[in-house]
Amino acid sequence: MKYTEKDPINYYKYIRETYENSYLAEDTTQIIIGINCSYLDSTMYSYEDIRDFIKNKNGISDFSGLFGVFAYETIHYFERINEIKSEQYYFPNFIFSDADAYLHFDKKTLSFTFHGDKSKYEDILTKCKEYEKNSKQLKKKNNKYSILTNKIKEKNNFIKIVKKAKKFIKEGDIFQVVLSTQMLISSNLDPMEFYEELSKQNPSPYMFYFPTKYGDVIGSSPEILL
């Protein structure tokens, strides 16, 4: 079936009205919507449990499997690091989703295919187009935000870790490192609206929107911003 450029996001929004536990992931060639997911996280399963689950999983498509994120603290599963920093907010060491069905969009051919039990999700697929028409009539709200992070303090901290990284590189301990800063923002902006705006301002090779009970996780490659 053919689709227009705005269809995938609208389809995803409509799907989430019925199946809230659904994610969206995209790269330069495709968009994948994982529908009606069950979740596996570190509060219920060990890392070994996840590996066993993957080995015994029967996929409904070539790209099916667990989708999720690792928190920084997951490094303790693989490396002996004594330092454990206090958390600024709670998030499990890892959380993965196992989708019951998939909607796959091919960006080159502008066609999409469904993978899963069609009889179970047929009603949603037929009503996605109607949702797209109604969404165009919605009025945009005035979005506001305020930065709560002390930007000067965060900048100074970032400079310190850059100097520390340079020292490690010179000493031969590391040859590549990913540095980052944290920013706390208060806003009335819906997370999905943020994702849509991010895709316009920073159309990166890989992006995802992953809602969880611990908070919505949005990811984007930073190459263009850099």
Where are these regions (language model features)?
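Extended alpha-helical targeting/anchoring segments
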Residues: 1-226
